[in-house]
UniProtKB/Swiss-Prot annotation:
Full protein name: Elongator complex protein 4
GO biological process: regulation of transcription by RNA polymerase II; tRNA wobble uridine modification
Pfam families (UniProt xref): PAXNEB (PF05625)
One GO MF term attached to the UniProt entry: RNA polymerase II complex binding
Function: Component of the elongator complex which is required for multiple tRNA modifications, including mcm5U (5-methoxycarbonylmethyl uridine), mcm5s2U (5-methoxycarbonylmethyl-2-thiouridine), and ncm5U (5-carbamoylmethyl uridine). The elongator complex catalyzes the formation of carboxymethyluridine in the wobble base at position 34 in tRNAs.
Species per Swiss-Prot/TrEMBL record: Mus musculus (Mouse)
Length: 422
């Protein structure tokens, strides 16, 4: 009986609390992510410039710098994931995706880490494309990257003004939006580069000829690069274990030509090499760093040069997102009139399955890219209409000739001839 009284009292107390909450005008239900981060509250979504939560799985997303590619990847690139770009045959178009990713980080004030074994990172950043911004957005961007801290009410006024205006998908856009467009014919302003924070890893500067750092697990270049990335992640508080004291930010990592002989790897030279596991070991450790930090990584790799295709399959399995570029240069499709409006095909080989068993791959097929004077665009591949006169359509001359022959035949029938000459 006492237990029943206790149970009844608990039910009564919960009902009274619910009634008091209803009388107070507040609901006891709270939307996910809107709860406070204090004791008893739910997790609070991070508010970082240049990011937004995914509507599918709640993951924090960053833009790749190409809005069309963001749409194909489910809204953007998830923080803590790896994007692999399989280079085209002559490495003409894949560096553009790399530069888009880096330029997007500068516009949003993210920290960059550029690693290359071929070109100096400072030179790579100087060749980034300039953003397409209107006059008001340029003023806002200067306020964000200036050394002086602007007043909070001024920032709120600018953000409130532009978020109510409809945004066009082509042309200049605001710097506060997710994803921007860039002008490939212009270079990013020097003022933005000076105000941005970046780290450069140039392999020849970190390896001396007499240095013996080879191991049975990793090459010397991979070891130095992992140490450099790990130091940047931990020193500046991008890892979750050591939160940043200041406002949280995103680390964008870009690695060029990974797996090529420039990195000391021989998977592009031999089919059965003894050290074919070094690249996969590197990706294992790198993904562990990404998963536990506020960072996103893009890697370009010459997959067409890898002799053993099983290595390419393993690298794809170790990547969260895989995008391949197929150029028409030097192929039969370059002179094919069906592909005259495009410069190559883009293959979305893998889409991340984060907190899901499956992913939607319905909109990632039959894609082509086109390089214009200022823009790199991704379009749905379609065949042009057949308007030729030889296929399914007669010309006026042929039609007139057939009419004349038909008229002559009919006149001969009228004169009593039994046979018609066709």
């Amino acid at each position: 009986m006492a237990a029943a009284d206790t149970c009844g009292a608990g039910t009564l107390s919960s009902r009274s609390v619910a009634s008091e909450a209803g009388q107070g005008g507040t609901s006891s239900f709270q939307r996910k992510g809107k709860a406070s981060g204090g004791p008893g509250g739910g997790p609070r979504l991070l508010s970082i410039a240049g990011t937004r939560p995914s509507v599918r799985n709640g993951q924090l997303l960053v833009s790749t710098g190409l809005p069309a590619l963001d749409q194909l990847l489910g809204g953007g690139l998830a923080v803590g994931t790896l994007l692999l770009i399989e280079e085209d045959k002559y490495n003409i178009y894949s560096p553009l995706l790399f530069k888009y990713f880096m330029a997007e980080g500068i516009i949003n004030g993210h920290t960059l880490l550029v690693a290359s074994a071929k070109e100096n990172p400072a030179k790579i950043l100087q060749e980034l494309p300039a953003p397409l911004l209107d006059d008001n957005s340029k003023k806002e961007l200067e306020d964000v990257h200036s050394a002086k801290t602007p007043e909070p009410n001024v920032n709120m006024k600018i953000a409130w003004r532009y978020q109510l205006q409809p945004k066009m998908e082509v042309g200049p856009v605001s710097s506060s939006r997710f994803g921007h467009y860039y002008d490939l014919s212009k270079r990013i302003p020097w003022e933005l580069l000076q105000s941005s924070k970046w780290h450069g890893f140039f392999l020849p500067e970190h390896i001396s000829p007499d240095l013996k750092g080879e191991s049975c697990f990793l090459s010397c270049g991979y070891m130095r690069l992992l140490e450099f990335i790990q130091k940047s992640v931990y020193a500046e508080g991008f890892d979750g274990a050591n939160p940043q004291k200041k406002q949280k930010n995103i680390l964008r990592i870009g690695i060029q030509n990974l797996g090529s002989p420039l990195w000391g790897d021989d998977i592009c030279c031999k089919e059965n090499c003894d050290n074919n596991h070094r690249l996969t070991k590197f990706l294992y450790i790198l993904r562990g760093l990404l998963r536990s930090s506020l960072s996103a990584c893009i890697i370009t790799m010459p997959a067409h040069l890898v002799q053993n295709k099983s290595i390419t399959t393993r690298v794809r399995n170790l990547s969260d997102t895989v995008v391949g570029l197929e150029s028409f240069i030097g192929s039969e499709r370059e002179t094919n009139p069906l592909y005259k409006d495009y410069h190559g095909l883009i293959h979305i080989r893998k889409i991340p399955r984060l907190n899901n068993l499956t992913c939607d791959e319905s909109d990632v097929k039959d894609l082509a890219f086109k390089l214009k004077r200022k823009l790199f665009t991704i379009e749905r591949l379609h065949l042009p209409p057949d308007l030729s006169d030889t296929v399914g359509r007669s010309s006026k001359q042929d039609l007139a000739a057939s009419t004349a022959r038909l008229g002559a035949g009919c006149s001969s029938m009228a004169e009593g001839k039994k046979h018609l000459d066709f």
